[in-house]
Amino acid sequence: VGFKAGVKDYKLTYYTPDYETKDTDILAAFRVTPQPGVPPEEAGAAVAAESSTGTWTTVWTDGLTSLDRYKGRCYHIEPVVGEENQYIAYVAYPLDLFEEGSVTNMFTSIVGNVFGFKALRALRLEDLRIPVAYVKTFQGPPHGIQVERDKLNKYGRPLLGCTIKPKLGLSAKNYGRAVYECLRGGLDFTKDDENVNSQPFMRWRDRFLFCAEAINKAQAETGEIKGHYLNATAGTCEEMMKRAVFARELGVPIVMHDYLTGGFTANTSLAHYCRDNGLLLHIHRAMHAVIDRQKNHGIHFRVLAKALRMSGGDHIHAGTVVGKLEGEREITLGFVDLLRDDFIEKDRSRGIYFTQDWVSLPGVLPVASGGIHVWHMPALTEIFGDDSVLQFGGGTLGHPWGNAPGAVANRVALEACVQARNEGRDLAREGNEIIREACKWSPELAAACEVWKAIKFEF
């Protein structure tokens, strides 16, 4: 036939509505907003082309390979209800386009280039279906939910955490003191803030030592296993690993990483180290809102959550749901299930565009954190269930009597909610009543309830 130079429409090659998706394909759902005058088929095909084998003009080297084998295909387009000129474009990518076990490569391919494309006004990646064959190339979370419970010997309830505040400015010794008080009072974990790395007022090594001392002391006094998320995030991968190694030498149970600012490559290395060395890995999602907050451009958090489960982490922050809109609650619970469960059915009402089978990849505990306090406990227990970490920063340290009583208040509230639920009571309806009853035999909880009573909780 010979080589025919020139520019041709993407849709001639990359829009294939008759394509039957394969079990090994990576499937993507994009929310596409084309520029005025660009037909949706062309926009969808452009996304498929630019994120796989295509470029803007025909090149003679196309003849040296089999495009049919390697090209991404836009196989379905549907208009978004209630939005003008916005479509969901479904794209299938052949498995061979991706390096095994590399979240970094997967993202570079799928979202690396196409988001700046001129034919599109905006583009958002809403969901990915990761095929079983690709899932199996990832180690995933270092340990997962069941192994974590066995390590901690804690069952049948959510775990409790607290971020140490003020996040910047405390000396290492005072920081360790705050950690000890919270753990001693009844929390399971305390946490380094995401921006606590190694600053002039508190170098990482000093912090690690004082926190380890706090953990050991609290464990000895309570007879429970305790942890503090030691943030190993650093300016280089080597420095990050050095901090993780030191944490292991101290014998602490868990370290922490900011996976978006630190990057997927660093995160996956750390996750492998954590599995090999028995460390749990807590993941903070600093920077996520830069990527996921705009509703028609960027990447939805459920995709970032799936990517984290592949890269590896035992906990990840996932919003609180509390006091938010009803719809957001369903969407949040959708990606919470994607983090924890082994098999998730497609359910558009919860934002889940594809059925996802994780084939026994360990699950991740969702962490609810941010602006929550004791009055929220019944709702949180009901919404998140046992497999979660509930984190109260100000809701612990803001207690009028101090950190330890703040921790006591949270633990009492949690145990009361779990007991009430196990007795068959309705937490959504009777939540406030359950907390009030518990106040009668816990002055610490009563004091906490008094401080935050004005912050109402609407279901």
Curated annotation (Swiss-Prot):
InterPro entries per record: RuBisCO, RuBisCo_large_chain_AS, RuBisCO_lsu_C, RuBisCO_lsu_C_sf, RuBisCO_lsu_fd_N, RuBisCO_lsu_N_sf, RuBisCO_lsuI
Modification sites for N6-carboxylysine: 191
Domain of life where this protein originates: Eukaryota
Post-translational modification (record): The disulfide bond which can form in the large chain dimeric partners within the hexadecamer appears to be associated with oxidative stress and protein turnover.
EC nos: 4.1.1.39
Active site: 165 (proton acceptor), 284 (proton acceptor)
Any one cellular-component term (Gene Ontology): chloroplast
Keyword Oxidoreductase attributed: yes
Needed co-factor(s): Mg(2+)
Site feature location: Transition state stabilizer: 324
Note: The basic functional RuBisCO is composed of a large chain homodimer in a 'head-to-tail' conformation. In form I RuBisCO this homodimer is arranged in a barrel-like tetramer with the small subunits forming a tetrameric 'cap' on each end of the 'barrel'.
Family, similarity comment: Belongs to the RuBisCO large chain family. Type I subfamily.
Record-given protein name: Ribulose bisphosphate carboxylase large chain
Organism: Garrya elliptica (Wavyleaf silktassel)
Gene name of the encoded protein: rbcL
